[in-house]
UniProtKB/Swiss-Prot annotation:
GO terms for molecular function: ATP binding; CCA tRNA nucleotidyltransferase activity; cyclic-nucleotide phosphodiesterase activity; magnesium ion binding; phosphatase activity; tRNA binding. One of its GO terms (biological process) is RNA repair. Mg(2+) binds at residues 21, 23. Monomer. Can also form homodimers and oligomers. A single active site specifically recognizes both ATP and CTP and is responsible for their addition. It comes from Burkholderia orbicola (strain MC0-3). ATP binds at residues 8, 11, 91, 143, 146. Comprises two domains: an N-terminal domain containing the nucleotidyltransferase activity and a C-terminal HD domain associated with both phosphodiesterase and phosphatase activities. Keywords: ATP-binding, Hydrolase, Magnesium, Metal-binding, Multifunctional enzyme, Nickel, Nucleotide-binding, Nucleotidyltransferase, RNA repair, RNA-binding, Transferase, tRNA processing. Magnesium is required for nucleotidyltransferase activity. This is Multifunctional CCA protein.
Length: 413
């Protein structure tokens, strides 16, 4: 039997970027031969094995045939006579359909095996499908979009984009389960240039099907004195890219993506103003998170950011009492780490605007100082001094926090 390193590892090696994961294909072997050599079977739909020492995945060479809609609708064929070229032919993109042989010692040996000219597409910075079988797996639309966020200088080949549009028009994208959609969006958000993912999804029509709330933002104008970029969709992409550039968490990046959803439903007769868009954003965000099964950490931060980002931008005008009420609404007193992420998302919002990516955001430091002062109040000591009257305790603690914030910032209550 022969072992080959395939896919992303070869692509990344040729691009000169760090190889994160290695996938291996075994040609000429049976499952019984693999287990006899100590490999542990883990695949459900087709034979995948873990190496006894490295725990890396090794899959038997296989072909696949579409049998039903969606990305689960495949029948796999694996046998010792399946060739490497046949295995590579089922892959999505030419740049992922390359291989190199692996020696018994585990080293890569020999030339790059490249039956579909993936190296030429790497040099041209092009995402190109291997064959028309690309249309059989709708996940590939999301994967190309995610790759675009990682390799921002690549473009999608015209013929590949045409196939993606056909898949969307045929309803293939609608067969994806929510968890897989979220998984790919989340991975794309964590890449260097998330806006490229959404550009590709918009270009093929997929974004309107999987996250219509975000797709609706393009073409919606904002006031140019606040938003020189004007277009809401452009603004949101700038915010997400700023958050990515700063290395912020997935929760912050998702909050950046969804903070202005309500602007997509602003009545046309009041544009470019967006009074009340924060509450509309919250109402759109709740079902979106439920539909995509967004994890609680990302959902909860996104809801707070959507509701409060306008208030955070205005904190320089707030008195101490208003600041404490903001802390109470956002649960900052109990969850200061999440409040720090709220600040990151709002800073990204302020700087994700044309020509304003380096503008000062003094609101963040003011809120950090104010929150530290509010949290310094000993609520337990106040409670012990009052007794069992819950309402009196609550009022006294609130007053003490207001006074502490006023003193720390040298402002009125």
């Amino acid at each position: 039997m022969n072992i080959y390193a395939v896919g992303g590892a070869i692509r990344d090696e040729l691009l000169g970027v760090p190889v994160q994961d290695r996938d291996y294909v075994v040609v000429g072997a049976t499952p019984e031969q693999m287990t006899a050599q100590g490999f542990r079977p883990v695949g459900k739909d087709f034979p995948v094995f873990l190496h006894p020492q490295t725990q890396e995945e090794y899959a038997l060479a296989r072909t696949e045939r579409k049998t039903a809609a969606g990305y689960h609708g495949f029948q796999f064929h694996y046998a010792p006579d399946v060739t490497l070229d046949e295995d590579l032919a089922r892959r999505d993109l030419t740049i992922n359909a390359m291989a190199r042989e692996v020696s018994p010692e585990g080293a890569l040996v020999g030339p790059v095996i490249d039956p579909f000219d993936g190296q030429a597409d790497l040099r041209a910075r092009v995402f190109r499908h291997v064959s028309d079988a690309f249309v059989e797996d709708p996940v590939r639309i999301l994967r190309i979009a995610r790759f675009a966020a990682r390799f921002a200088d690549f473009t999608v080949a015209d013929e590949t984009l045409a196939l993606m549009r056909r898949m969307v028009d045929a309803g293939e994208i609608d067969a994806l389960v929510p968890e897989r959609v979220w998984q790919e969006i989340a991975r794309g958000l964590m890449e260097a240039k998330p806006s490229r993912m959404f550009a590709v999804l918009r270009d093929c029509g997929a974004l309107a099907r999987i996250v219509p709330e975000v797709d609706a933002l393009w073409g919606v104008p904002q006031r140019a004195d606040y938003h020189p970029e004007v277009d809401t969709g452009v603004h949101v992409m700038m915010v997400v890219d700023y958050a990515a550039k700063q290395g912020y968490s997935l929760a912050v990046r998702f909050a950046a993506l969804t903070h202005d959803l309500g602007k997509g439903t602003t009545p046309a007769d009041v544009l470019p103003r967006h009074v009340g868009h924060e509450s509309r954003s919250v109402e759109l965000l709740k079902p979106l998170c439920e539909r995509l099964r967004v994890p609680n950490e990302s959902r909860d931060l996104a809801l707070v950011v959507a509701r409060e980002h306008g208030n955070l931008h205005r904190v320089m005008e707030m008195g101490a009492a208003a600041l404490v009420r903001l802390f109470e609404r956002s649960d900052a007193l109990r969850k200061p780490a999440r409040f720090a992420e709220l600040l990151q998302a709002c800073e990204s919002d302020a700087r994700g605007r044309l020509g304003l990516d380096a503008q000062p955001y003094p609101q963040a430091e003011r809120l950090r100082v104010a929150l530290a002062a509010a949290r310094s109040v000993d609520a337990g000591a106040i409670a012990r001094g009052i007794g069992n009257d819950t309402e009196k305790i609550k009022e006294a603690v609130h007053r003490a926090r207001v006074q502490a914030v006023a003193q720390a910032l040298a402002i009125g209550e």
